[in-house]
Amino acid sequence: MKFSKNMPADGKYLLYLLTDITLRFMKLIISSSELLKGVMAVAKAIPAKSALPILENFLFDLKGNMLEITASDSELTLRTQIEVESTAEEGRIAVPAKHMMDLLKELPDQPLTISTTSDSSFMCSWASGESTLPYFPAEDYPEITGTDETAVTLEFPAQSLVDGIASTIYATADDEIRPAMNGILFDIDVASTTLVASDSHKLICYTTADVKAQEKASFILHKKPAGILKAIIGKDAETVEIAFDSKNASFKFGSTLVICRLVIGKYPKYRDVIPQNNSNILRINRTQLLNTVRRVSVCSNKASNHIKFDLKSGSLTISAQDLGFSIAAHETMPCQYDGEDLTIGFKSPFIIEILSNMNCGELVMKFLDSKRAALILPAEEEAESEKICGIIMPIMIS
């Protein structure tokens, strides 16, 4: 038994020791497949390497017939609960994540008995075998800090949140100087909520009228937890309960809880850059435009990825060339175009990203001239309560 400097010095000392010992021991029976689902649900938070080696473990907390599993990298925490078949002894231990996952992946679905055998090891027993693994004291696991009493709370339809993240996350930046650009802005208003992402070359807004607040609020969610949320919110989830303060945010759905630190910083005034008076309007089939851009961009310069749009009444010609390799391509498409003849250049990967992440049949592109941002949005609203728009900066062309 290790002695701690923080041990009580009065008559409660014996109780402290007994409690410390009890919490380190546990025994339960659980479905191996259900346990695998549980650990995989939180495994994305396990760091590959950490300054705190304890974070390379799952924290198991057994209370009654519920096993709570926690994984964290100190910035992001995932927690879920699963029901066990029987509990012989409650407790809390930290178990090695990789070894636990590797073992469970190789087991067919069957009852699995987990029991501590000493103050540093536990046994996983199944019908035809067993495995002994080390564990670590739960008190070594860092305390997880959630939101405080100032937190703003709201409910977000699960599918709308997934769609909003999927529609914007690809436009986030990797900017060490402006960390706010590395996340998605949740701009919450009394009439709607808008998710915004930008890397300065393109800006994407996803607005839903299903989420409102009594007063305006906002937070910036880093792309990593945003991507994990998109991946782990299942189709059976109906609502995500969100709480956020000035430092942290939590997302609760079903038996899963996600806690993460927010990006600290001020997001640019994105509404100021959304074009309002672009009068040259192109209406075209999204899939056909996407496929044409992909074909033509094969012959673009691989360093610049420049492609050119030549817009005239009734037609759009897309062209690209790489003088260094003496290759070029162009393709003309029928379209509906109302406006002045216009030639404008773009980086093909940005166009491809935006078009690939819109689900509409037809889209509208609005231009002012060859030097200012173009606006891209669905020609028809896919749902009355949701809308998406993209803004892309042009490039100078010769």
What is the meaning of each model-derived region?
Residues K2-S398:
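Structural preference for solvent-exposed beta-strand-turn elements
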